[in-house]
C-alpha cells in the first residue's frame, strides 16, 4: 500500500512540474519550406536549393565547391561535370563561373571548360617532352590530343616558350613549334641541297622528295638567300610553282641571250622560254632597257636587221622592182612576224602610195605594177579588134566607163578605210604591229577562188550603181597568171597569183576603154561603107520572118492545147526572138551600138538599148521585148506591128502565091538537110516535120521534144505500114539515147565492167538497126512522096 502511495506522489510531482514548466515550439518540414521560399521571394535570404529539393546551398558555397572541384580534377573541369557534382541547376553554375573568372585571373573558360594556369603549365611540360623527342610539334596535332582550340593553344604555348618549352615557333607559320636542334639540322640540309643546284628547280618537288617541312623550308631558304649564303633567287613566292634559280644559271642564261642577240640580231620568245625564262618579253625589256628593239608577236629583232630590210625595200622601190624580205630574215621568224616587221619598215619610209605589199612579205613598187600592166597593152588591142567582129562589146558606152570609174573609186576608198581601221587597231594594241600606213597598200586575196571568175565584191558594188557592170572580161585570173609566169621567171607562185588577182580590175577597166576606142574608130570609118543596115533590107527580112511566123502559127493549130503551148514557146524563143533582134539592132545602129550578128543580142543587151531610146520608141519596143516572155503568138505579132510602126518599118503581108513559095522553099530546105544528115534523132525529126507538111500543107516549127506528138498526129494521115515504121524508128532512137546516157552516167567502178559490156552490146545493136532503117525512113519523104504527093 505504501508503494502505491509512493507512486501516486511521484506522478503528482511530475504533473506539477509539467504544469509549471515552459512549452518548446516545433515547425513541420512543409512550414519550414514555405517560410524559406517567402524569405527568398522578399530577398531577405539568398540560397539555392539542390536538384533533389532536400537541401539549400548559398552562392558562396557553390563557388567554394566549384574551386574545390577544379583543384581536385587537376585544373580542368567541364561545367556539366560541375553541375552533376554540386547537384544544382546548370544556370547557377554558369552564373558563378563569370564571378570566378573575374576574381581569379589564373582561371579561364574555354569551350565550356574551366582551365587554370597549373593545368596549362603541366600541358606545356608534356608538349616540351614531345618536342624534345621529335624535334617539332604542330598545333593541329595538339588540338586533336588535348581537345582544345588552336588559337588558345597557340597563345598559351607561346607564353611558355623559353620558360617551360625549349623551342621556338615559326613566325610565318605559327602552327608549328621547332627545337633549335631541329631547325639547325634542317637548315644544314637545305643549305647543302640548294648549294648543289645548278639549274632552275621546282621547290615543291624537293619538298616531296626530301621530306622537308614546307613552311620551315621557305623560311630558311629565304633567310639563306637574303644573307647571301645561297646565290640565287626564288621565283613564284611560297606557292606550288615556286622555282629556285641559282645565280650561276642566271649568269649563263644571260650570257647566252646576249651572245645570241649580238650574233643573230633577234631573239625568239620560245627559245627564252625553253631556257627557263617564263616571261620572255618582260625579261628582254628589263635587260635591254637602252637597246632599240622591235617587238613582234613571237620574237624581237634588233635595229641592224630592221635597217637591212629597210635598205632592201628602199632599193626595190627606187629601182622599180620587187623584193621578198622573207629570205633576208631568219628562217625561224614566222610569216606573221615578217609582216609586222615589214609594216614597221614601210611606215618609216614615208613614201606615200609608192608600193604594194603582197603575201605579207613581198614589196612591189608601183612602177613595177605599171610595167606589168603595160605588158598586156598589145594583147588588149589584138583582142579588142577580134571582139569587135564576134561579140557585142561596143555596147559599152561612155556612161558604162563612167560607172566603172565610180566603182574603182569606191573600192579604193573602201580599201583605204579598211587599212586605216586596221592601222589604228593594231597601233592601239601596244606593240609595233601597224599596217602599211599611208605609204603602202597591203593586198590579200581569198585562196578558195583562185581563178577569180566571180568577184567577191560584185554584190557590194552593184548596190552602189544599181546596174550590172558590162559582161566583158579581158582575161581571167588563171590566164593572167600564165601570162605573168612567162615574164616573171623567179617570182613565187603565191605572189604571181595575188598579183594576177590585183591586176584583174585595172586590166578589165583599161580593156573596156580600149574596146570603146576601137569601136569608136571603126564606126567612124565604116559609116560610109554600108555597115549600117538599110531600111529596105530590114523591111524585106522582117516581112519574110513575119509571114513565116504566120504560117508556123497555122500549123500549130492541128495539135492539142498542151502541144500548142510547147510549140508557141519554142517559136517565141527562136524566130520571134530573131525578128525582135533585127528591129533592136536597126535602132542600135543609130546609137552607134549595132552588132554584126543580131543573133548575139541577149535580153540584157536589149534592155541596154531600150535605156538609150526616146520615150516614144521605148514604149512600143518594151512591149515587144516583154511579149517574148508571154504565151501568145497573136500578142507578139500585135506588139511587132506597133513596134514596126514606131520605127517606120513597113511590113509586107503575104498573099496565097507568096505562101506557096514559102512552103516550097521551106520543104526544099528540110529535104536538103535530111539528105545529108546521119544523126538518127535529126533524121526522125526532119522526116516527121516533112510528113506533117505533106499531109496538112502547113509549115511546122517544132522542138525535138514535140516529135512524139507529131508522129501521133500522123497516124491518121499516112499509111499504117509507114506509121508503124516511123514508130519503130522512134523507139530505136529513144533506146539509143537512153543507152548512151546510162553509159555516160556510169563511173569507173570495177563491179560495173560487166554491165558496161552489156550496155555496149545494146548500143551497138541499136545503132546497127538504126542504120538499116535510116534509108527507109528517109525514103518515106524522098521517094514515095514523089509519086503520091505533088506540090508546087
Swiss-Prot record:
Coiled coil: none annotated. Residues 200-400 are annotated as: Mediates interaction with TRIP4. Induction: Expressed in response to endoplasmic reticulum stress. By lipopolysaccharide (LPS). Catalytic component of the UFM1 ribosome E3 ligase (UREL) complex, composed of UFL1, DDRGK1 and CDK5RAP3. Interacts with E2-like enzyme UFC1. Interacts with RELA. Interacts with NBN; promoting recruitment to double-strand breaks following DNA damage. Interacts (when phosphorylated) with YWHAG/14-3-3-gamma; sequestering UFL1 and preventing its association with PDCD1/PD-1 substrate. One of its GO terms (cellular component) is endoplasmic reticulum. InterPro entries: Ufl1, Ufl1-like_C, Ufl1_dom, Ufl1_N. Residues 2-212 are annotated as: Required for E3 UFM1-protein ligase activity. The modification Omega-N-methylarginine is found at residue 433. Ubiquitinated, leading to its degradation by the proteasome. Interaction with CDK5RAP3 protects both proteins against ubiquitination and degradation via the proteasome. It is found in: Endoplasmic reticulum membrane; Cytoplasm, Cytosol; Nucleus; Chromosome. Belongs to the UFL1 family. The gene is UFL1. Keywords: Acetylation, Chromosome, Cytoplasm, DNA damage, DNA repair, Endoplasmic reticulum, Membrane, Methylation, Nucleus, Phosphoprotein, Transferase, Ubl conjugation, Ubl conjugation pathway. E3 protein ligase that mediates ufmylation, the covalent attachment of the ubiquitin-like modifier UFM1 to lysine residues on target proteins, and which plays a key role in various processes, such as ribosome recycling, response to DNA damage, interferon response or reticulophagy (also called ER-phagy). Catalyzes ufmylation of many protein, such as CD274/PD-L1, CDK5RAP3, CYB5R3, DDRGK1, EIF6, histone H4, MRE11, P4HB, PDCD1/PD-1, TRIP4, RPN1, RPS20/uS10, RPL10/uL16, RPL26/uL24, SYVN1/HRD1 and TP53/p53. Residues 412-471 are annotated as: Disordered. Residues 453-471 have a biased composition (Basic and acidic residues). Residues 2-200 are annotated as: Mediates interaction with DDRGK1. The modification Phosphothreonine is found at residue 534. This is E3 UFM1-protein ligase 1. Its main location: endoplasmic reticulum. Residues 121-250 are annotated as: Involved in CDK5RAP3-binding. It is an enzyme of class 2 (transferase).
Amino acid at each position: 500500500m505504501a508503494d502505491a502511495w509512493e507512486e501516486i506522489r511521484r506522478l503528482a510531482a511530475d504533473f506539477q512540474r509539467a504544469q509549471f514548466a515552459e512549452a518548446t515550439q516545433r515547425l513541420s518540414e512543409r512550414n519550414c519550406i514555405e517560410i524559406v521560399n517567402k524569405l527568398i521571394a522578399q530577398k531577405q535570404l539568398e540560397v539555392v536549393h539542390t536538384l533533389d529539393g532536400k537541401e539549400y546551398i548559398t552562392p558562396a558555397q557553390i563557388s567554394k565547391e566549384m574551386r574545390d572541384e577544379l583543384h581536385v580534377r587537376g585544373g580542368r573541369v567541364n561545367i556539366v561535370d560541375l553541375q552533376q557534382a554540386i547537384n544544382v541547376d546548370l544556370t547557377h553554375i554558369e552564373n558563378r563561373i563569370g564571378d570566378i573568372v573575374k576574381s581569379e585571373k589564373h582561371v579561364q573558360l574555354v569551350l565550356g571548360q574551366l582551365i587554370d594556369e597549373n593545368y596549362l603549365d603541366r600541358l606545356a611540360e608534356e608538349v616540351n617532352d614531345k618536342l624534345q623527342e621529335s624535334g617539332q610539334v604542330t598545333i593541329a596535332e595538339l588540338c586533336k590530343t588535348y581537345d582544345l582550340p588552336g588559337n588558345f593553344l597557340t597563345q598559351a604555348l607561346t607564353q611558355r616558350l623559353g620558360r617551360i618549352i625549349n623551342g621556338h615557333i615559326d613566325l610565318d607559320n605559327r602552327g608549328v613549334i621547332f627545337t633549335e636542334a631541329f631547325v639547325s639540322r634542317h637548315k644544314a640540309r637545305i643549305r647543302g641541297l640548294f648549294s648543289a643546284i645548278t639549274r632552275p628547280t621546282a621547290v615543291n618537288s624537293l619538298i616531296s622528295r626530301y621530306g622537308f617541312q614546307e613552311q620551315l623550308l621557305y623560311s630558311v631558304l629565304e633567310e639563306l638567300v637574303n644573307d647571301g649564303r645561297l646565290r640565287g633567287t626564288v621565283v613564284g613566292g611560297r606557292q606550288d610553282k615556286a622555282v629556285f634559280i641559282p645565280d650561276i644559271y642566271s649568269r649563263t642564261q644571260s650570257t647566252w641571250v646576249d651572245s645570241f642577240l649580238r650574233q643573230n640580231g633577234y631573239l625568239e620568245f620560245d627559245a627564252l622560254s625553253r631556257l627557263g625564262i617564263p616571261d620572255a618579253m618582260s625579261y628582254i625589256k628589263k635587260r635591254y632597257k637602252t637597246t632599240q628593239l622591235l617587238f613582234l608577236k613571237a620574237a624581237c629583232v634588233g635595229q641592224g636587221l630592221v635597217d637591212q630590210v629597210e635598205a632592201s625595200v628602199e632599193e626595190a622601190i627606187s629601182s622599180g622592182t620587187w623584193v621578198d624580205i622573207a629570205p633576208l630574215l631568219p628562217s625561224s621568224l614566222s610569216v606573221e612576224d615578217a609582216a609586222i616587221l615589214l609594216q614597221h619598215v614601210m611606215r618609216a619610209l614615208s613614201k606615200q602610195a609608192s608600193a604594194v605589199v603582197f603575201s605579207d612579205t613581198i614589196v612591189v613598187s608601183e612602177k613595177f605594177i605599171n610595167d606589168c600592166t603595160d605588158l598586156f597593152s598589145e594583147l588588149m588591142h589584138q583582142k579588142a579588134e577580134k571582139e569587135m567582129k564576134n561579140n557585142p562589146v561596143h555596147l559599152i558606152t561612155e556612161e558604162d566607163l563612167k560607172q566603172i570609174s565610180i566603182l574603182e573609186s569606191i573600192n579604193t576608198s573602201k580599201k583605204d578605210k579598211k587599212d586605216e581601221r586596221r592601222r589604228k587597231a593594231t597601233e592601239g594594241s601596244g606593240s609595233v604591229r601597224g599596217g602599211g600606213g599611208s605609204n603602202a597598200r597591203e593586198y590579200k586575196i581569198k585562196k578558195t577562188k583562185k581563178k577569180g571568175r566571180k568577184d567577191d565584191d560584185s554584190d557590194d558594188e552593184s548596190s552602189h550603181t544599181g546596174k550590172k557592170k558590162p559582161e566583158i572580161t579581158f582575161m581571167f585570173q588563171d590566164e593572167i597568171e600564165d601570162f605573168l609566169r612567162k615574164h616573171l621567171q623567179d617570182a613565187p607562185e603565191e605572189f604571181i597569183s595575188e598579183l594576177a588577182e590585183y591586176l584583174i580590175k585595172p586590166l578589165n577597166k583599161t580593156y573596156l576603154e580600149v574596146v570603146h576606142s576601137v569601136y569608136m574608130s571603126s564606126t567612124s570609118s565604116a559609116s560610109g561603107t554600108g555597115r549600117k543596115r538599110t531600111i529596105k533590107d530590114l523591111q524585106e527580112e522582117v516581112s519574110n520572118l513575119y509571114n513565116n511566123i504566120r504560117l508556123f502559127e497555122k500549123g500549130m493549130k492541128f495539135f492539142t492545147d498542151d502541144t500548142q503551148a510547147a510549140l508557141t514557146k519554142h517559136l517565141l524563143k527562136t524566130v520571134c526572138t530573131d525578128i525582135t533582134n533585127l528591129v533592136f539592132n536597126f535602132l542600135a545602129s543609130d546609137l552607134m551600138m549595132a552588132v554584126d550578128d543580131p543573133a548575139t543580142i541577149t535580153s540584157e543587151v536589149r534592155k541596154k538599148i531600150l535605156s538609150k531610146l526616146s520615150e516614144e520608141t521605148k514604149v512600143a519596143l518594151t512591149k515587144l521585148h516583154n511579149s517574148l516572155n508571154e504565151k501568145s503568138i497573136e500578142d507578139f505579132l500585135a506588139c511587132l506591128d506597133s513596134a514596126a510602126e514606131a520605127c517606120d518599118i513597113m511590113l509586107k503581108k503575104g498573099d496565097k502565091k507568096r505562101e506557096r513559095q514559102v512552103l516550097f522553099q521551106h520543104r526544099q530546105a528540110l529535104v536538103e538537110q535530111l539528105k545529108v544528115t546521119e544523126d538518127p534523132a535529126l533524121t526522125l525529126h526532119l522526116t516527121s516535120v516533112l510528113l506533117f507538111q505533106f499531109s496538112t500543107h502547113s509549115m511546122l516549127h517544132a522542138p525535138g521534144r514535140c516529135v512524139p506528138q507529131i508522129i501521133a498526129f500522123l497516124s491518121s494521115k499516112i499509111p499504117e505500114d509507114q506509121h508503124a515504121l516511123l514508130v519503130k524508128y522512134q523507139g530505136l532512137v529513144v533506146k539509143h539515147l537512153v543507152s548512151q546516157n546510162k553509159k555516160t552516167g556510169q563511173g569507173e567502178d570495177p563491179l560495173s565492167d560487166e554491165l558496161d559490156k552489156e550496155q555496149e552490146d545494146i548500143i551497138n545493136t541499136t545503132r546497127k538497126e538504126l542504120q538499116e532503117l535510116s534509108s527507109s525512113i528517109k525514103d518515106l519523104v524522098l521517094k514515095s512522096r514523089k509519086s503520091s504527093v505533088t506540090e508546087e
